[in-house]
Design a protein with these regions (language model features):
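Conserved catalytic cores of ATP-dependent inositol ring kinases
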Residues: 1-484
Length: 484
């Protein structure tokens, strides 16, 4: 088979905000044609979508940043994307699939963008105009001009866009509808500061950290430390589990009128990867004045319940994320490991080569609050945010009693043999931290490493137990890297 990608009208383009005088650059080449060994051709056509904005912002408050404007970092781009319109069998001259779209109605970005006061030269116009950008939704997919799949969505400017129904219509006119239901509590507005370490809603509003006054006051060391601790506490997860489930999928109702219900609970961890990414430590932050960090943020599936059309429970799968499970207690210490240390307040000593060679101080002191914590390696090293070493799956009745024993799944996780590895060599690697005290280590969250993320999260064993906790069956899994 031969796969052909790209083409002027089959490519996404972008235009960097900081390089607005540049020409648009191609960033994604979509599949345009498939040719079989027999010469049969399938062609994909696309249509232009409305322009979009993509990017991120972060802040760093440092004692050396005397002007609050210098502490802001932003990286945005203008996107010119395309969307799939048709799939055509060129050889047989027939349309295999058609895709139809329309503008969506959903929660927009605030017209008074929270970050505009932190720009060097006043508000950035395209930020304040971001609410005017149109986001399309997929309305229907038609297969062979015979089978029609239709999609309906929420239609409100006060909530995120969510799929409500999927309806299949056959050539004979028979319809089958799947309905999706969500938790009714709404997420807050965009860029308002209501999020935990993993980006989930936790109800804490720390948007005042984006104000000019905060940046001006935070150049004082004592205030900066106090603000840094408060910021850290506000990034903790929602222990109660109400806010973190906002607008999450709650249930699916099938054409038979049966349904599947999803029950969630907050993530709970017992360990976290140290800030220098060398060890696994207990779930506590490395400086005083901060609480236990066993609730880092986000949520996990707790139960999956299936009901018939009369609302009678058919099956229930209950998941336990613990190291030591017994049929009687069903609890214990969490097997969860956070892939980073959620540290936002830093006191650094950075090695200064030039000064040390000229009789000056060897280290340069820097104190800072950083909005991105100690996770700069999220995108090339961390793997998952949280890894669970053991997950127990139980089939239970409506009273929570085991029906046919339970199954223990063991996964590879941070620890011996699965930590990221040192680079072969690195320049200027002298690094230490004043706050919290940690002197002389050559490692930091920013030290390059060889990632072992692909080794983590792999199923190592699957054990089936009876009611009394006796092993009935055990499977072991081994993996060999293709190359290293």
């Amino acid at each position: 088979y031969k796969y052909i990608f790209g083409g002027t009208d089959k490519t996404d383009y972008n235009l960097p905000f900081k390089g607005f005088l540049n020409l648009p650059a191609p960033i994604t080449w979509h599949l345009s044609k498939i040719i079989t060994p027999a010469g049969h051709e399938i062609e994909f056509t696309y249509e232009i979508m409305p322009f979009q904005i993509n990017g991120n912002m972060s802040f760093c408050i440092s004692l050396d940043a005397l002007f609050w404007q210098t502490a802001m970092s932003y990286d945005y781009e203008l996107l010119a994307p395309v969307q799939l319109a048709t799939v055509k069998d060129v050889t047989d001259n027939k349309i295999l699939a058609r895709f139809h779209y329309s503008p969506s109605t959903q929660l927009p970005y605030d017209s008074q963008y929270a970050w505009e006061t932190c720009m060097d030269h006043g508000p950035a116009t395209f930020f304040t105009k971001e609410k005017n950008f149109t986001l399309n939704k997929l309305n229907s997919v038609v297969i062979l001009d015979k089978i029609n799949y239709q999609f309906t969505y929420t239609n409100s400017s006060t909530e995120r866009l969510k799929l409500k129904t999927l309806t299949k219509t056959t050539p004979s006119g028979t319809q089958s509808t799947y309905s999706l239901n969500y938790f009714p509590n709404h997420l807050p507005g965009y860029n308002t500061g209501h999020y935990d370490n993993l980006g989930f809603n936790n109800g804490e509003n720390f948007s005042y950290y984006f104000s000019k006054e905060f940046f001006e006051n935070a150049i004082f060391a004592d205030k900066q430390i106090a603000e840094g601790k408060e910021y850290t506490n506000k990034r903790m997860g929602d222990k109660g589990g109400f806010r973190v489930t906002a607008e999450m999928l709650k249930s699916i109702t099938y054409p038979t009128h049966g349904r599947t219900e999803f029950i969630y609970e907050p993530n709970v961890i017992s360990s976290m990867v140290s800030a220098d990414r060398k060890t696994v430590q207990s779930a506590h932050l490395p400086y005083p004045g901060t609480p236990d960090y066993t609730y880092p943020g986000g949520l996990r599936i707790k139960e999956i319940n299936n009901y018939d059309s009369n609302d009678e429970l058919l099956t229930r799968k209950h998941y336990y994320y613990t190291k030591e499970f017994t049929p009687t207690t069903k609890g214990g210490v969490s097997s969860g490991i956070l892939s980073f240390t959620p540290q936002y307040l830093w006191g650094w000593q950075l090695y200064n080569l030039l000064k040390s060679q000229n009789g000056g101080p060897e280290y340069y002191t820097l104190n800072a609050i950083m909005s991105q914590a100690s996770n700069p390696l999220w995108y090339n090293s961390r793997g998952e945010y949280i890894g669970y070493s053991k997950v127990i799956e139980c089939n239970e009745d409506k009273n929570g009693k085991l029906i046919d024993g339970y199954t223990v799944h063991t996964f590879s996780n941070f620890g011996q043999g699965y930590m990221d590895e040192d680079p072969i060599a690195i320049l200027n690697n002298k690094f230490s931290r004043e706050y919290p005290p940690h002197f002389g280590t050559p490692y930091s969250p920013y030290t390059p490493c060889s990632s072992n993320a692909l080794k983590r999260g792999m199923l190592l064993s699957k054990e089936q137990f009876d009611y009394a906790g006796h092993v009935k069956q055990k499977e072991l899994f081994e993996y060999t890297p293709i190359q290293k």
